[in-house]
Each structure stands twice: as structure tokens, then as C-alpha cells.
Amino acid sequence: MTLANAELAAGLRVAVMRLRRRLANEHDPEHDLSIGAMAVLGGLYRLGELTVGELAERERVRPPSMTRTIKCLTEGGYVTRAAGEYDRRQVVIALTDRGRSAVIADRRRRDAWLSERLGDLSIEERDVLRAAAPILEKLAEA
């Protein structure tokens, strides 16, 4: 790793972690769910039904940890569990209307906060962020 990459990595890490914490504080009080639980709901919202194993892999956690998260979300009425269509041993997780509403409300609240902050930036700064967003997504998926 070059010195320039190390400095960039440190700066990005600090900025991304601070922004993550700030966005985490903008949760919907009606749906007081952990960041991990909201990530699971968001994944189901984007991708549709998934198995516990697929969710665990996607969130980079162990299946037993995902099973605990799914148990809480099921008890809260945010998701349903059903046997797989082709393999009845598989458990498929799907969003309920309550889960979908939680995702939508959470995104609206966080997007509103972020949109307000973006309004304080110059056009040039917003253009830089617009260009950086897909690159940051690529880093997150690596």
C-alpha cells in the first residue's frame, strides 16, 4: 500500500464512519430497529425474498446471527418465514407490509436529513459526491 493510498484510506474511513453514525441517529422512532435489522429489511426491499443463508452472506454475518435477527424481525411483524418453494427445508424470508413501511419511513427520514445537508454544499461539491457515490458503492460491495 502506498502512502497516498494509506492516507486516502484513513480519510475515507473516518468520513464514512462519521456519516454512518450520523445517519444512524436519523432512524424512525416508530420502528426502533438496529442498523443490522434495517439493513436486512432494506435488502429484502431491494431484492425480494431471500433465504437466511443468502441474507447472512449478503450482510457478512454468520447464519446463527442472522437467524437471531430474523427471529426479532418476525416477532415484530416485519418479516415472514416460509418453506422454500422447491426445497421445503429452506427457509425463505419476505417483507410484510409493516416491514415495507419501516424501510420506506426510514429512507425518507435519512434522505431528508442528508438532502438538507447537501443543500449547504456548493454545486461543485455536490457534483464530486454524485461522481463518488457509485465508487463508494463499489468499495462497499468488494
For each of these PLM feature ranges, what is it?
Residues 71-131:
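Charged, amphipathic alpha-helical coiled-coil/dimerization segments
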Residues 9, 13, 37, 41, ...:
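Generic structural concept
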Residues 7, 23-26, 31, 108-142:
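Amphipathic alpha-helical dimerization/coiled-coil segments
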Residues 18, 45-46, 57-58, 105, ...:
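Alpha-helical structural segments
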Residues 1-35:
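N-terminal leader segment of winged-helix/HTH proteins
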Residues 52, 70-71:
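Short, hydrophobic-biased segments on the C-terminal half of alpha helices
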Residues 23-65, 76-78:
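N-terminal helix-turn-helix DNA-binding core of bacterial DNA-binding proteins
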